[in-house]
Amino acid sequence: HLCAELPFARVNTGEYLGYSGKRRLIESHAVDVVNVHGSIGMSRDVARLAADYGIPVSLGNTIMEIGVHLAASLPECLFLEFSDLRWNELAVQPVEFHDGLAIAPDRPGHGIEFDRDKLAHYAAPGG
C-alpha cells in the first residue's frame, strides 16, 4: 500500500532479496522500481519479470565495468548505482562518466583489464 500512498515518491527496494522475494514484490505491485543486485543471470531474469509488469529496475553496485555492461543491456534499467571505490583504480581503463552517465566500453567481453602493477602493489603487505 506504500506505493499507492506515496504518489510523489518512487519506492525502490529489493536489493538484498533473492529471486523469489523480488518476484513477490513485483507480482504484488509493492514496488515502483526493483533494485536488482546479485548474479548477472538473476539480475536479467528479475529485469525481464519486472518488464512484464511495467516496472523499471535499478542496478545495485556491481563491480567495475560489469555493472555498466549489464545496465546497458537492460532497457528497463533506470539507474546504475556505482561507487567509485578503489577497485576502479585497478583497471587499465577505469569506468568513464560523461554528464553523470557511465559509458559502456566497446572492448570485447566484459571490458575489464587489470593493471598488474597495481594488483601487485595491493597484494604486497602494507599495500
Name each model feature, range by range.
Residues H1-L101, P108:
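Shared catalytic-loop signature of beta/alpha-barrel
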Residues D84, K118-A120:
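Low-complexity, compositionally biased segments
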Residues I103-P105, F114:
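Active-site or pore-adjacent capping/gating segments
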Residues D106-P108, K118:
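C-terminal beta-strand edge segments of enzyme domains
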